[in-house]
Amino acid sequence: LFLGSTCIYPREAPQPMPEDCLLTSPLEYSNEPYAIAKIAGIKMCESYNLQYGTNYIAVMPTNLYGPNDNFNLETSHVLPAMIRKIHLAKCLHTGDWEALRKDMDIRPVEGVSGKASEPEILSVLDKQGIRPGEVELWGTGKPLREFLWSEEMADASVYIMEHVDFEDVRQKEGEVRNTH
């Protein structure tokens, strides 16, 4: 099983993304090296399957989240950041400074831990768009995103490895363009 990434699709891919738009136009510049490596892996799997009769299947997980995720507001992906922002805003809104300080001791924000003064904590959270009863989400709001619980992806991966063969997804006529 080869795990690809949705970043392999073109920057301007239609939504929802059809599989056949792979390699049809430029990639998102900031993801390009990673995307090219993933595309190379997919193509390697296809080539090995065709040339050596192997049974490599490539799947493209969407945005995964789950246990042990990265909730650091400065380095996390979108969903863990949103979950944490909402949690911290709720703590502020309800005045639950104990829970807020505990959270910030585990994961300081911009170097500010739960041991800091209330004004310091409020200031750093405000810079992150976290206020009592209010959460500011960044970005344009235009990207469409899908999220999948990591344990469901794990279950699907096991199922695919046990029940899906390359020949099941291969088009019998013409070129193999992608097999995910």
Language-model segment annotations:
Residues 5, 61-64:
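Active-site loop/turn elements of alpha/beta-hydrolase fold enzymes
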Residues 1-32, 57, 70:
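Conserved Rossmann-fold NAD(P)-dependent oxidoreductase catalytic core, especially the SDR/UDP-sugar
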Residues 23, 40-41, 149:
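Conserved cofactor-binding/catalytic machinery of classical short-chain dehydrogenase/reductase
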Residues 33, 37-40:
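Active-site helix of classical SDR
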Residues 52-58:
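Conserved Rossmann-fold SDR core element
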Residues 26, 136-143:
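Catalytic Tyr-x(3-8)-Lys segment
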Residues 50, 64, 80-136, 145-180:
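Alpha-helical substrate-binding/gating segment
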